[in-house]
């Protein structure tokens, strides 16, 4: 089962709905859930978006403790938390709209971007963003608005996206989530 960590984002229910449409077992759980409870039940973990890093509950601990055990996908805030956990830099994106249609260039088609074209249109939030990826991570997508639209670990199944694949406005969003479900052994 894929467990979706709820960081109080407005779209968390759409992540589960996408998995439901695929027939993939998924459950939304509070970000206060103990990492050990997540470990016992998860074939994979999605760290959802949300309004602030200060309200991320145990999301950082879940990333730290489950790294190398199950695939983890960070979306928006989850992407930023993953970067922070591994030593990357996250900062405010001055002068950027909070949500915007963004053309994203896929630089690396491994993992969650397998089978996707080189460019997609995505719905993204850029209030905060990853400014520097951690060591052992590579940038897998970029845009004119954000140099780190997505990243992945060089060896472990850790993926982060600044944009929202769960939204219908994001081209190939369901394909990204389907690729993640495959990495989790759910498809």
Curated annotation (Swiss-Prot):
InterPro entries: Class_I_gatase-like, GATASE, GMP_synth_GATase, GMP_synthase_A
Gene3D superfamilies xref list: 3.40.50.880
Record field: catalytic activity: XMP + L-glutamine + ATP + H2O = GMP + L-glutamate + AMP + diphosphate + 2 H(+)
GO molecular function: ATP binding; GMP synthase activity
Pathway(s) per entry: Purine metabolism; GMP biosynthesis; GMP from XMP (L-Gln route): step 1/1
Entry's EC annotation: 6.3.5.2
Keywords: ATP-binding, Glutamine amidotransferase, GMP biosynthesis, Ligase, Nucleotide-binding, Purine biosynthesis
Keyword Ligase: yes
One Pfam entry name: GATase
Active site: 76, 164, 166
Domain Glutamine amidotransferase type-1: residue ranges: 1-187
GO CC terms in record: cytosol
Quaternary context: Heterodimer composed of a glutamine amidotransferase subunit (A) and a GMP-binding subunit (B).
Job description of the protein: Catalyzes the synthesis of GMP from XMP.
NCBIfam families, per the entry: guaA_Nterm, PRK00758.1
Protein name: GMP synthase [glutamine-hydrolyzing] subunit A
Gene name for this UniProt entry: guaAA
């Amino acid at each position: 089962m894929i467990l979706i960590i709820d960081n109080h984002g407005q779209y968390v229910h759409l992540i589960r709905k996408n998995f439901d449409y695929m027939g993939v077992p998924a459950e939304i759980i509070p970000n206060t859930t103990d990492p050990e409870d997540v470990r016992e039940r998860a074939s994979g973990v999605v760290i959802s978006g949300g309004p602030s890093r200060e309200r991320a509950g145990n999301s950082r601990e879940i990333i730290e403790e489950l790294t190398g055990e199950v695939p983890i996908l960070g979306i928006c805030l989850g992407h930023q938390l993953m970067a922070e956990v591994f030593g990357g830099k996250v900062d405010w994106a001055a002068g950027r709209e909070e949500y915007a249609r963004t053309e994203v260039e896929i630089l690396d088609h491994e993992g969650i971007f397998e089978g996707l074209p080189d460019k997609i249109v995505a719905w993204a939030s850029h209030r905060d963003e990853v400014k520097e990826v951690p060591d052992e991570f590579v940038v897998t997508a970029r845009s004119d608005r954000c140099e780190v639209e997505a990243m992945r670990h060089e060896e472990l199944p850790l993926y982060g996206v600044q944009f929202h694949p769960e939204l219908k406005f994001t081209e190939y969003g369901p394909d990204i989530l389907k690729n993640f479900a495959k990495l989790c052994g759910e498809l």
